Amino acid sequence: MSRGYTARGFNSGRVTMRKIATGRAWVMALALLAGGSQSVAADLVLVAGATGRTGQQVVRELNAAGYRVRALVRDPAGARNVLGDGVEYAQGDVRERSTIDAALKGARYAISAVGATRKDPANGPEFVDFQGIRNLAEAAAAAKLDQLVVVSSAGVTREDHPLNKMFDNVLIWKGRGEEAVRASGVPYTIVRPGGLTDKPGGQSGVRLEQGDKGTGFIPLADVARVCVAALKSPAARNRTFELYSAQSGPDTDWDAAFARLAADPAPGPVQP
């Protein structure tokens, strides 16, 4: 029962079923009987990069949590083959700002799981991990979203990281994308996972670190769990952290974990 309402209260003169005969009052009464909590089902989340390995896990986690999910995809028909029918589809591309603006209509949150590919230079790190993320952040700020969660990567501050030599300075461009998110003005959470694995999620705890000095691995499913947990936690806002698996048992108190993190300092100017 919700606080202030008891079973006796519903049978007394204060609140009776006769007094809530029709319409919205019935809905309110049912909500009270259910415990007074509001479902997140009406909250729409736009997911960029929804068909990728991390994005698919994010969509699955959002659906399990009762959110409405809208996937920003280049090919809706192809995406439907991957994600199924329990998702809305908005045709667009993070490299094209106008398509993001349209896709964000009605959304309360957004999660980015985008990443560059080696196959097409036009999908390289500069254009996806920096310019695309900047487009998404600025569109999210213009749409006054409650929060933008961005999956980045551990190692973004290490210019000598081998991945930069192997893949067109991918971590440097991801770092530039992070800077654009911080400067955009939208409330945000930046998640920097370590090496990604396909192991089942929820089997162990996770380590939330700051300073970009650690190493480790993390299941994709656990990255998705943390992203979705951050959506409803004020303690996660305007924070950047690395994410690795831990030896402890599965985490349950996400608010406490986020609250132990330091908030990001005020952002500086972003290079064009």
Predicted regions and their residues:
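NAD(P)H-binding glycine-rich loop region in Rossmannoid oxidoreductase-like domains
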Residues: V45-L46, A50-R53, A71-A142
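Bacterial N-terminal signal peptides
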Residues: A25-G35
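Glycine-/Pro-rich loop/turn segments that contact NAD(P) or position catalytic residues
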Residues: A116-Q210, T215
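Conserved cofactor-binding/catalytic machinery of classical short-chain dehydrogenase/reductase
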Residues: E96, G132, G177, P219-D222
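Sec/Tat signal peptide C-region and signal peptidase I cleavage site
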Residues: S37-A41
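Mid/C-terminal beta-alpha module of Rossmann-like enzyme folds, strongest
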Residues: A42-T51, Q57, A221-P272
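Aromatic pocket-lining residues of Rossmann-like dinucleotide-binding sites
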Residues: L62
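Bacterial N-terminal signal peptides that target proteins for export
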Residues: V15-V27
